[in-house]
């Protein structure tokens, strides 16, 4: 609708106040949110991928979490687990970082297949089962998984069947010379002055 279009324009305006360039990437992120999909992003570190998603989360007053995928990561580190409380003698459920609106899975191909599968299951089911209890992730829910196309040593490539779980694959390139000049000019902590464009319920 026209109102929805105006709201998205407000979101774009606010994010672009902070993130210079990467318009193609930002637009794909918004498409994924509205279509309830997820993104697989390829690009070297330092291209504002984290900043873009974090800024977008702040713009809609959503929650944002980042997980650095490593070879020693466990599925429980993502989804959560049951913890024993010595003081009370009871078990309680501790939910993992997937319970957020915007999740950045940084270098997903650095974690073993069982961890990748745990994340992909949450992406598809939008819920987690811990000790027989189901817990739904919040809405909106967007997973942006990144891969570094240059450093592949010691990685666990995603099988094609798992790559298909993502709505789209986005290649993030370097900014232009003009954009780099603007970036240098604007390194003044502008993120502190952001305005809310809409909230989770409106989205």
Residue spans of the language-model regions?
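Short beta-strand-centered segment that lines the nucleotide-binding/catalytic pocket of NTP-utilizing
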Residues: 42, 63-75, 131-139
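Walker B catalytic acidic pair
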Residues: 43, 106-107, 118
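Canonical AAA+ ATPase core
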Residues: 85-89, 107-115, 123-198, 203
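P-loop (Walker A) phosphate-binding loop of NTP-binding proteins
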Residues: 44, 78, 146
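Walker A/P-loop
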Residues: 33-70
């Amino acid at each position: 609708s026209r109102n929805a279009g105006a709201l998205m324009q407000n979101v774009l305006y606010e994010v672009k106040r902070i993130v210079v360039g990467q318009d193609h990437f930002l637009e794909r992120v918004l498409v994924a949110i509205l279509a309830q999909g997820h993104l697989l992003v390829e690009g070297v570190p330092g291209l504002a991928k984290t900043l873009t998603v974090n800024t977008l989360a702040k713009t809609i007053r959503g929650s944002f979490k980042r997980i650095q995928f490593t070879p020693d990561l466990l599925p429980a580190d993502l989804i959560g687990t049951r913890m024993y409380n010595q003081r009370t003698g009871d078990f309680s459920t501790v939910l993992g970082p997937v319970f957020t609106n915007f999740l950045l899975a940084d270098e997903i191909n650095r974690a073993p297949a069982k961890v990748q599968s745990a994340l992909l299951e949450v992406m598809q089911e939008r819920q987690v089962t811990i000790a027989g209890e189901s817990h739904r992730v919040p809405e909106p829910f967007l997973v942006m998984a990144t891969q570094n196309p240059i450093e592949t040593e010691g990685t666990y490539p995603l099988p094609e069947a798992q790559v298909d779980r993502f709505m789209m694959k986005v290649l993030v390139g370097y900014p232009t010379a003009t954009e780099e000049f603007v970036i240098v000019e604007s390194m003044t902590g502008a993120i502190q002055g952001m305005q809310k464009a809409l909230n989770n319920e409106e989205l």
